[in-house]
Regions:
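Residues on the lipid-exposed face of transmembrane beta-strands in outer-membrane beta-barrel proteins
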Residues: 65-71, 114-120, 148-154, 234-238, ...
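Gram-negative outer-membrane beta-barrel transporters
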Residues: 124, 247-260, 265-366, 427
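Residues that define the transmembrane beta-barrel architecture of outer-membrane proteins
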Residues: 59-63, 108-112, 142-144, 228-232, ...
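Transmembrane beta-strands of outer-membrane beta-barrel pores
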Residues: 87-93, 112, 132-138, 166-170, ...
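Membrane-embedded beta-barrel scaffold of Gram-negative outer-membrane proteins
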Residues: 1, 193-282
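Face-selective signature of the C-terminal outer-membrane beta-barrel domain
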Residues: 1-99, 104-140, 248
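Conserved C-terminal beta-signal and adjacent last beta-strands/turns
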Residues: 313, 329-431
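Repeated loop/turn-to-beta-strand initiation elements of outer-membrane beta-barrel proteins
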Residues: 75-81, 125-128, 157-160, 242-247, ...
């Protein structure tokens, strides 16, 4: 192209003519778009694995139906009753770049569930709510999870709440089916099909930690299970000081069973024997941790109404998960978070103007992901908004910013930086 283009310019051709001639020469032998030759080359390029410079192709779909129905009209003499259910169909379609799905043959996963919730006021100071839910994933046994909550009215506008909850989580689509070569290691799912694909039955893998500490332990590719959680929560919400002060506080304790995390195992490239830590094949694999893992946290929020429609607010929360060494938990929640705010929804001569300012801070923590790990630094942002009402049309004009000072931060390892977002909005017939 360059030789023909420069030759054309030197012979007196205008730029467009020289470019057209050079393009004709350069495109000789180039397959036409949509031709069999083009499709063949396209398919070869898109199947190049990530370590060799290729990319990911993910055209997966999720189809779902959710519904609920309030039966209280028919059951109010006994209690308030709500029933509901859902159905989901996952179609994993990556042409073998992310999942082990053959070309044009997506991997299907079907889930469905149903629930019933019953709420009853036993007397003027006690309300009970109980619910039960059943869910089924085609790759796992069905799960039933009950919950019960009590709301105790201590006095007017002052309530305590107690709850006992059970929950579950089926392994995600990637935890089941991911199959990604990242050059330094392979990231795979927990589906049993990987046993034969990577010959773990004839060429076993070994825990990386066991090879490092000299106590060699074989990894047996255990059956993948849903993780379950049992939790208890206590809370209080009330209005104090002539209903100017609102306090909302809670604390919780949870106990995970079969917690899903990731570990590293190593397999010999020679096909047998104890693998070498530095030269043999490393896999990141999902496991269910056999011991209970505990989580706990608390939070408190305070809102106070000042004269002339001013208000101030603050909330602080903490979340903690006790993770054993060597287990990648992907908890990815900061231990501490803080929000402070001041606002006024109507001030000025006609009480049409308003504003809100919010300060947000988040503690730093060690981020764990399937593709990258690392220290995530703490960050803080300032959000602000001003508004003006137009009573005749029941409209509001708003001008505001999220991260007003444009302090760049990122909230996950590998994510792009987030800067300021500035906006203007107009709402019509809102009040």
């Amino acid at each position: 192209y360059i030789t023909t283009y420069l030759s054309g310019l030197m012979s007196g051709q205008v730029d467009s003519a020289a470019h057209a001639r050079a393009r004709i020469v350069a495109d000789q032998g180039r397959p036409a778009l949509g031709s069999p030759q083009f499709k063949d080359m396209y398919n070869k390029v898109r199947r190049i694995p990530v370590p060799k410079g290729g990319g990911l192709l993910d055209r997966s779909d999720l189809w779902g139906i959710d519904g609920s129905y309030n039966l209280s009209e028919y059951t109010k003499s006994f209690a308030d009753v709500i029933v509901g259910g859902n159905w989901r169909k996952y179609l994993l379609d990556s042409d073998s770049t992310l999942f082990p799905d053959p070309v044009d043959k997506p991997i299907g996963i079907t889930e469905f569930g149903a629930y019933v919730q019953i709420t009853k006021e036993l007397n003027s100071w006690l309300k009970l709510s109980a619910s039960g839910r059943y869910d089924k994933n085609e790759n796992f046994k069905g799960r039933f999870t009950p919950r019960i909550t009590a709301v105790i009215k201590a006095k007017e506008n002052n309530n305590f709440r107690l709850s006992y909850q059970t929950a579950y989580r089926f392994p995600s689509t990637q935890q089941q089916w991911i199959d990604l070569d990242l050059f330094s290691y392979k990231l795979i799912g927990g589906n049993k099909s990987f046993v034969s694909k990577y010959h773990f039955d004839t060429n076993p893998a070994y825990y990386r930690d066991s090879l490092q500490n000299g106590v060699v332990k074989q990894w047996d590719y255990p059956l993948q299970k849903p993780e379950s959680l049992t939790s208890f929560e206590v809370g209080y919400r009330g209005l104090l000081l002539d209903q100017k002060l609102m306090i909302d506080a809670y604390g919780y304790w949870g106990f995970y069973q079969d917690f899903t995390g990731r570990i590293s195992v190593i397999q010999s490239k020679s096909g047998s024997g104890i693998p070498d830590l530095n030269t043999d094949q490393v896999y990141s694999v999902p496991i269910n941790y056999h011991d209970n893992i505990n989580t706990n946290g608390f939070g408190i929020g305070v809102d106070y109404r000042l004269p002339r429609n001013f208000s101030v607010s603050a909330n602080f929360s903490s979340d903690n998960l006790d993770v054993p060494a060597g287990l990648t938990a992907n908890f990815n929640t900061p231990k501490y978070r803080l929000n402070l705010g001041v606002a006024n929804s109507s001030f000025g001569k006609d009480k049409r103007a308003g504003f809100a300012i919010n300060y947000r801070w988040q503690d730093g923590f060690y981020f764990e992901g399937d593709l990258a790990n690392g220290d995530l630094p703490a960050f803080q942002t300032l959000d602000a908004q001003v508004s003006y009402k137009f009573p005749k049309t029941k409209s509001i004009l708003k001008l505001g910013a999220t991260n007003l000072l444009n302090e760049y931060y990122y909230n996950a390892i590998g994510n792009s930086y987030v800067g300021g977002l500035y906006y203007i909005s107009f709402g019509y017939n809102l009040y």
